[in-house]
Each structure stands twice: as structure tokens, then as C-alpha cells.
Amino acid sequence: MTRAVTIPPLAPASTVALIRPAAGGLEVFMVKRHTAVAVLASAYVFPGGQLALADSAGDIAALCDGLSGVRDRMGSVLDDEARAFHVAAVRELYEEAGILLARNRDGKAVGERSGDIDAVDKGRDALAAGRPFATLVAAERWRLALDWLTLFAHWVTPDIEPRRFDAYFFLAVEPEAQDASHCGRETSAGVWMRPADAIARCRAGEIALPPPTWTTLRQLEPFGSVDEAMAWARSTTVPRIQPGFGFQGTTRIVTLPGDSALAPVPGFAAKETRFALENGRWRPIESL
């Protein structure tokens, strides 16, 4: 008798690639996952995580700017769902990197008003202690700046993985008056890196990068400024990308669209399309 295969359900998630100007180009903020976490242990990733029920609640919607464009390039996603993905992106970036994409009561970026940074730091601690995000935002008279997020990618975990995510990736620029820092709960380090440097460190075996993170860094690598990167993100198509899974000999591999084992997806191109898992780390290998 053939046993039915159960595919784990998808959990909606948001990820933010936070960038800032650097000499001759840009840097991106990455966090190192703790060794004991259930997903992507020890890997360097962008801040992000699963959507919470409160991300789609009406009270948080009333505290958002930029609602008119949240569905842009999100396909069949409904308005409320699209807003929730954006709210989750802002919340997760705040929790994991200490960066709040919001306007203060004067309509300026949070951080530009006296007392803002102290409120941001205390609010982050309160959020970690269980204070509802909407309650915190409303009390400080902040407005979440959903329009500062630009969608650029949509990644879906392969069917075979035990924990699967339907993740939208957003690009954002670090507000000038704020400084990113890792949270210390799910992550053990936070670092700004040039995309090319992160790729080089991964090739050298110094850090671990999951295939979607690697691919994003390769996409950001050519840009000479944050303006160029944001212009690209605003204009790029956002196809649904679900990597393939298999084995090459006894080695576990993941393939991306365009690999010999996986059909191309219009609007998606990657410099590397095949990754092997060796010693707990993914590394790009030649496609067969």
C-alpha cells in the first residue's frame, strides 16, 4: 500500500533587506541566527519572521501610512493580507534589528524628534516583554511607514521541508537617525556587510547563507548606491519562486528556476541555480 505524503502547510512570513550607503555602493544588515533555533540555525539572514494575528487587525491598520500601494505586485493577495505582510515586515525589523520604519507625531521619520530614539529603544524592550505592537505605536502617536518598504521577491519553501514559509522580501533604507542592532533572543550577532563581502565570506566558509539570502545578495551586488537598488526593487517583477529539492549522489541539493532540473520562471534570473548542503552549510555548485 502506498502511503500518502503530507505536505506541511505554508506559514506566511515577511523579510526585510535593510540597506544603507557605503563608500562606492551599499551595505546590507544581516543577523546571525542562534545555534539552537529551529529554522536556519547559525545562518546569516535578513531580519524577518512569521506574520502574527495582530498584524492583520483593524487597530493596526488605522496606524499605517502607504496603504494604497500595498497590493502592488503581490498577485492575488487580498488587501488585508497585503497590509499584514507589510505590517509584519515593519514589526519584525523593529524586533530583530531595532529599526522602526515610522513617522513621528510631526510627520517626520522617527528619530528626528527629541526623545524619539529613547522611545524606540524602550518600545522595543516593551514589545519583547509582550506589549501589543498596535498599543505601543498608538501610545507614541507613530504612523507605520508601509510606503518605505519596497517588495522585490517572493520565496516559497520546498514541499519536502518540515517547516515551510510563504515569504515576501522587502527592501528598505535605514533611517538616518536610527542604528541597527540585533535583538539577542533569536540572533547572536548583527552586522553590516557589502553584498560582495558576504558572498566572499560564504565562499570561504566563514559564514552560512541560505540560497534565498545568497541570491538576494547577488542581486544587490552590482548597485553603486541605495538609490539604484531601490529603483531596481520598484521596477522588478516579483514571481513566486519555489526551489526544487533532490540529491546529487548522496549530497542534498536545492535548485532554483533556470537550473537544468527546474523550469525557468519568467522574470527570475539567478547567477547560481544549484546549491549543495555540506557540513550544515549551503554552497553553490555547478548545474549538471
Language model regions located:
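N-terminal leader/linker segments that precede catalytic domains of diphosphate-processing enzymes
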Residues: 1-288
